[in-house]
Amino acid sequence: MNSMYRIYPEKRYRKTLAILQRFAPKGTSILDLGVRNPFSDVMEKEGYVVSNTEGEDLDLHPETLKDYQGEMVTALEILEHLVNPFGVLQQLPAKKLLITVPLRLWFAKAYRNDKDPRDCHYHEFEDWQLDMLLEKAGWQIQYREKWTHPVGKLGFRPLLRYFVPRYYAVYAQRMTND
């Protein structure tokens, strides 16, 4: 296993990076929504030019995205933290988009951190919900992938995590009026 995965979620990072490499050549400039994070470093180590947003409240001010540039936007575990992801998706300053979100699990409650109101999930999508949201916001889906997230614990719910997909990735391109 590569050393970058010793601390981070190995499967999620590996899958996300593989999708990114499939649709964006090295050297692509990427706006990674959210503050700088460990996966921002992974993308840079793989040859991408990465900038991040600065912690703005994108629900209240999605128009601030127009101040950023990038050939591609990544929103990796970001949309579920937004009250209004539709407004953000409309304002993205690129023609290519890679999104990952946690899927809604029928056997688990939505994630909530009582100590940090920014670290809560307003949405845990079903795949069709994210697809509809993207299409309504002007994006055409080119690729989709789901994967499980085993947690290595004992119990009924941890067992289900071996079989029920937890993450959903979508690569999309902005629709044009041509």
Predicted feature residues:
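Flexible, active-site-proximal loop/turn residues at the rims of small-molecule/cofactor binding pockets
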Residues: 79, 88, 103
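Short N-terminal helix/helix-N-cap motif within the alpha/beta-hydrolase-1
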Residues: 83-87, 109
